[in-house]
Amino acid sequence: MITCTFAGHREVFGSCTQKIENALETLIENEDTLYCYVGGMGEFDGFSAAAVRNLKRKYPNKEIRLTLVLPYMQQKLNEYKEYYETSFDDILIPAELAEIHYKRAIPARNRWLVDNSDYLIAMIWRDYGGAYTTLRYAQKQGKKIILLER
């Protein structure tokens, strides 16, 4: 079993779904199980989730799971309940984040994503911001990183 997560800037210019899907295929080619954690906070997360869904259709005999990991409860889960229930296998708000102030919850969630994954698939071109901080954290933790070209 392999677990992976994603990091990228909120704004992505053009689709990168195929690049992400290609990276995921290298992970699953010799494995039967792939668990993917996505943050759901920007365009890169959306493209990442789409790539995982494409892979699920392409490899129906493999166990590929897509989990949305949120930093805190959000109203959009109730407003768009059907979308979330059909788009993700699981929706998780880690218990460790319950006591964290909401302004610090997103960086804490990003660290949780890295801590609970074997791989980080990232597309980062700026040396600041949450995605960059997540990449640096993954590097310090010795995680395997697949850095995609923009």
Placement of each model-derived feature along the sequence:
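Acidic/glycine-enriched connector segments
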Residues: M1-R150
